[in-house]
């Protein structure tokens, strides 16, 4: 099991293949992704790499983290993330991970935070059909309708789909295929859409449920 990387979502575009089919692509940039530290089985109980990205002002770093970055002999980072790895996949501290960490045709899993939508109704949040547009319905056309039963149980069960805060959740999209890699621009072109807004940070890992390379 290899380490993943922290990347930045740039935006979306589309291309046409040899068959004339339109393929949607998400552009992901890998820039300054660096190994900050190691977690070992003997000391911490598991094997992992600590990956950092985006330089930070030294004045905004806490004293304990200043020592961590000083020991690694690298500049402070804003984003830090641990990636579990197998024992034979350690990478030297201060090493920089580039786009060639992955290959064209490989399947990856993307973890990102969805765009926040604020307080949303049941029709937008849970795809409810709503009530009738006429025939006796007043002021409640987009409401969710009944939420409970009767005197027994006399309550609304936890988990009932209702209006509430929508979005801003961490989700993982699995088995997305890498269409192309641009080493000069440090871009990975991934087929399909990825959660999150432009310039948001996300995690790219080898697909756990699918073969890494297609033949």
Curated annotation (Swiss-Prot):
Residues 136-155 are annotated as: Disordered. Keywords: Methylation, Ribonucleoprotein, Ribosomal protein, RNA-binding, rRNA-binding. InterPro entries: Ribosomal_uL3, Ribosomal_uL3_bac/org-type, Ribosomal_uL3_CS, Transl_B-barrel_sf. PROSITE patterns: RIBOSOMAL_L3. The modification N5-methylglutamine is found at residue 151. GO terms for cellular component: ribonucleoprotein complex; ribosome. One of its GO terms (biological process) is translation. It comes from the Bacteria. Methylated by PrmB. Pfam families: Ribosomal_L3. One of its GO terms (molecular function) is rRNA binding. Part of the 50S ribosomal subunit. Forms a cluster with proteins L14 and L19. One of the primary rRNA binding proteins, it binds directly near the 3'-end of the 23S rRNA, where it nucleates assembly of the 50S subunit. Belongs to the universal ribosomal protein uL3 family. This is Large ribosomal subunit protein uL3. It comes from Rickettsia typhi (strain ATCC VR-144 / Wilmington).
